[in-house]
C-alpha cells in the first residue's frame, strides 16, 4: 500500500492507525496495517465482509492506486476481495515477469478467479478462489472476480455470493 510518491504506508507515521489493533496483528507490514483497519471495523460491529469494504474505502482515501486484494476468514465467513487500484499491470511488474521469462503472464498479475463447487447431488457446497499461478480456464468453470468485488462464502453451508465494495 503506497501513495502516489511510492512511499509505503508503513513509513507514513502520519497515517492514523489504531496502535492496539496494529500490534495485535503481530506484523509490521502494509498487510498488517490493512488487517488492523479491518479489525477496527469488526470492533465497531460490522460483519467481516462489510469491515473489509469499509477498510478499503478508508485506505483508498490516502492510497487510491494500491491493490487491496486479499482473502480473510472468520469462524463464519470467507471473504476474497479483488480491489486493484490500477486496471493495467504496471510496467515494473511486466519487467519483473520478463526477468524470469514469464512476461506473457504479467497480464494476469492482479486477476482473481473463482469456481463454484457442488456436492454429489449437484447442490452448491463451496467455492474455490485463486489468484494467478496456474491455468484457470473458463471452460472448467472459472469466472473472473471483477475489480471492486468480493466473494462472501459461508464456512458452514458453502453458499456464496458476489458483492461490490
Features from the language model and the residues they span:
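N-terminal segments that mediate ammonia production and transfer
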Residues: 2-165
Amino acid at each position: 500500500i503506497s501513495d502516489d510518491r511510492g512511499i509505503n504506508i508503513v513509513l507514513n507515521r502520519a497515517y492514523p492507525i489504531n496502535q492496539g489493533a496494529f500490534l495485535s496483528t503481530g506484523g509490521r507490514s502494509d498487510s498488517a496495517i490493512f488487517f488492523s483497519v479491518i479489525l477496527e471495523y469488526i470492533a465497531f460491529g460490522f460483519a467481516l465482509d462489510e469491515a473489509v469494504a469499509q477498510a478499503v474505502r478508508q485506505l483508498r482515501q490516502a492510497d487510491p492506486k494500491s491493490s487491496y486484494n486479499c482473502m480473510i476468514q472468520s469462524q463464519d465467513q470467507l471473504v476474497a476481495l479483488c480491489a486493484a487500484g490500477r486496471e493495467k499491470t504496471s510496467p515494473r511488474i511486466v519487467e519483473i515477469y520478463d526477468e524470469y521469462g514469464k512476461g506473457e503472464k504479467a497480464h494476469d498479475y492482479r486477476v482473481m478467479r473463482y469456481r463454484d463447487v457442488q456436492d454429489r447431488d449437484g447442490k452448491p457446497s463451496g467455492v474455490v478462489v485463486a489468484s494467478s499461478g496456474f491455468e484457470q480456464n473458463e471452460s472448467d468453470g472459472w469466472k473472473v472476480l471483477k475489480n471492486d468485488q468480493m466473494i462472501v462464502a459461508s464456512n458452514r453451508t458453502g453458499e456464496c455470493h458476489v458483492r461490490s465494495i
